[in-house]
Amino acid sequence: MKNLKNIIVVILLACLLAGCANDQYSIEKNYWKAKKSADSIFNNPHASPPFELERAVKLLDAFSKKYHENDLSVDAQFKIASLYLVKKQYDKGRARLGQIIDVYSDSKLVSSEALFLVGKSYELEDKWGLALNHYKRIIKEYPLTKKGFDVPLYIAQYYKIKYQPDKMNAAYREAAVHYKTLAGKHEDSLIGFSVYNLVARCYMALKEWDKSIDSFNIIIDKYKGKVNLDSIYLNTALIYKNELKNKSGARGMIEKLIEEYPQSKLTNTATDLLKEIDKK
C-alpha cells in the first residue's frame, strides 16, 4: 500500500511538472505570436507605417499584462521601448524605459539595462552629454551588473570611434581607477578576478604594458589555485614577447602555462610560441 501511495505521488508530481512545462510552452508560443509584428518593424523600421507600430505595441502590451509574472513580460516591455527607439520616437521610448525602471526597481539587472537604453537613446539623438550622464549613473548605481562592468570601457570606445584620442585615453584611465577600486572591494571573490582583468584591458588599450603586466601578476598572486590562469599566462607572455621584447619574461610565463595546465587548449599555442622564441 505504501509503495502504491509513492507511485501515485510520483505520477501526480510528473503531471504537475508536465502541466508547468506545457504552460511555459504555451506562453512562449503566445509571445512568439505577439512579437511577430515587432520583428517585421525591426527588420525594416523606415518602411513600416504608423499603424503597424501601434499594432505591435498593443500586442506586446497585452501579452505583458496577461503574463506579468513571467520573465517574458519584461522582455516584451523592452521590445516596446526598442520599437520606439528604432522608429526615432525617443521620448516615448524613454517614457517606457522609465516605467520599466519603476516597476522593476528591485532588479538591478533590469534597471541597469533600461538605464543603458535611455543613454543610448540620447546617443542616437547625438546628445552625448545626456547619454554620458546616464552611463555614469550605471557605473555609480549598478557597478556589479553586466552593464556596470561594460560601460566604463564602452565610454572609452565611443571616444575611439569618434577619433578623440585625448578623451579616449582619459576615459581608459578613469575606467582603470574605477575597476581597481571595485576589485579591491571584492578581491576575495571571482568578481575581483573579473574586474582585475578589466584593469589589464584598460592598460593594454593605453599601451602601458608594464601596468598591464602588473595587473596580470596581481591576478596570478591572488587567484592561483582558485581559477584557471592559462589565458592570463599566455596574455602576459605575448606582452613580454611582442611589446616589451623580453624573451625571458615570455619564456617564464609560457613554461608556467605548460607545467600547470598540460591539458589546456592553449598548451599547443604556448609550445609553438616557445619554439618561436628559442629560434631567435
Where in the sequence are the language-model features?
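Bacterial N-terminal signal peptides that target proteins for export
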Residues: 1-8
